[in-house]
Design a protein with these regions (language model features):
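Bacterial N-terminal signal peptides that target proteins for export
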Residues: 2-14
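Bacterial N-terminal signal peptides
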Residues: 11-23
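Short solvent-exposed coil/turn linkers within tandem alpha-helical repeat scaffolds
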Residues: 47-49, 85, 144-156, 171, ...
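SH3/SH3-like beta-barrel superfamily modules
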Residues: 53-96
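Boundary regions of SH3-family modules and the immediately adjacent low-complexity/disordered segments
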Residues: 79-123, 164-167
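Short coil/turn linking the two alpha-helices of tandem helical-hairpin repeats
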Residues: 83, 117-131, 162-174, 206-218, ...
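Helix-turn-helix repeat elements of alpha-solenoid scaffolds
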Residues: 129-142, 174-184, 217-227, 268-274
Length: 320
């Protein structure tokens, strides 16, 4: 039989549970997202002379826990995942100088973080640029849609982060053969359909359908030419439309040489005409002058029967 005392204890415990859940929920709601725009050492306490725990890189995902003053400067206590790339990682807490921290409430915070992403991306492209700058740019761009989902820069930040991740994966694929993860590019397409960023993401995804090597056979360039042509026709307003048409035309030019080497003149002539037609679409439909000039060059080579596939190809169909 349940006594009144027992009922009271149960009600008291239930009230405690509800209160705890409310406190946790309130803390989660108040926890402020933040990131760094320069690398800093995480300290065990506020102050320049405190013990250093770990180096925190640009663009790391942070949660503000507390604020304080030390050495006449503002400091923030933060929580962060030790491994920023892992889905599950040990959390570490410590103190950072507040001057390098940008939060979701920082005025123009989205532009500041995005701008540091652009700077890091440029560093990655420069000879002798900062080590790890590409990963910095990836993290910084990722923070923009996470911290400022309503920002005009959110879609572009998501796309640039996904593209950098993809380019790094391509380098790793060439070295190790590790498959490239499509998830982040597909998120761009899902969250910003019909946008410029979605069209660029769709173009990147074509990489996973290309052959690692042609081995002088017609199958791969035939398939790849069709892929690029289909993309150009499905995404006529894409910034990559002209490039896609050129890639389709160039592969037809390569097929012209492959079939000629195999003494299949009818297929060689058909590929030549197809290549010319695709290149002419660039001249008539696209505005990018660089791709127009490249199309003109390719048409000239096709009309003059100048080989484009392999520098050692000669007109007899033999190799030097």
């Amino acid at each position: 039989m349940v006594t009144n005392r027992k009922i009271f204890e149960l009600l008291f415990l239930a009230a405690l549970a509800v209160t705890a859940a409310f406190v946790i929920s309130a803390f989660a709601a108040e926890a402020e997202r933040a990131t760094l725009i320069r690398g800093e050492s995480l300290s065990s306490s506020a102050g320049a002379n405190a013990q250093k725990i770990v180096q925190v890189e640009r663009g790391s995902a942070l949660t503000i826990l507390e604020r304080s003053q030390a050495d006449g400067q503002p400091w923030v206590k933060i929580s962060m995942a030790m491994d920023q790339q892992a889905q599950v990682s040990r959390e570490v807490t410590g103190w950072l100088p507040a001057k390098s921290v940008v939060t979701a409430s920082t005025a123009n915070g989205d532009e500041i973080i995005f701008g540091q992403g652009v700077d890091s991306e440029r560093q990655a492209e420069e000879r002798g640029g900062r080590k790890g700058a590409a990963q910095d740019a990836l993290r910084l761009y990722s923070r923009v849609p996470e911290m400022f989902p309503g920002s005009p820069l959110a879609a572009e930040g998501m796309w640039r982060a996904a593209d950098i991740r993809w380019q790094l994966a391509k380098t790793d694929f060439v070295r190790s053969g590790k498959p490239m993860e499509e998830k982040y590019l597909r998120e761009v397409i899902a969250k910003s359909p019909q946008s410029k960023q979605a069209e660029l993401a769709a173009y990147d995804l074509l990489d996973n359908q290309l052959c690692p090597e042609w081995r002088g056979l017609a199958e791969c360039p035939t398939k790849e030419s069709a892929l690029y042509e289909q993309y150009a026709h499905e995404h006529p307003q894409s910034p990559k439309a002209a490039e896609a048409l050129y890639n389709a035309a160039w592969r037809q030019a390569a097929l012209t040489d492959i079939y000629r080497i195999n003494n299949d003149r009818s297929k060689s002539d058909a590929a030549r005409q197809k290549g010319i037609a695709l290149a002419q679409q660039i001249q008539s439909q696209q505005q990018d002058q660089d791709w127009k000039m490249r199309a003109t060059d390719l048409i000239y080579k096709l009309e003059k029967k100048i080989p484009v596939y392999g520098v050692d190809v000669v007109e007899t169909g033999e190799t030097k």
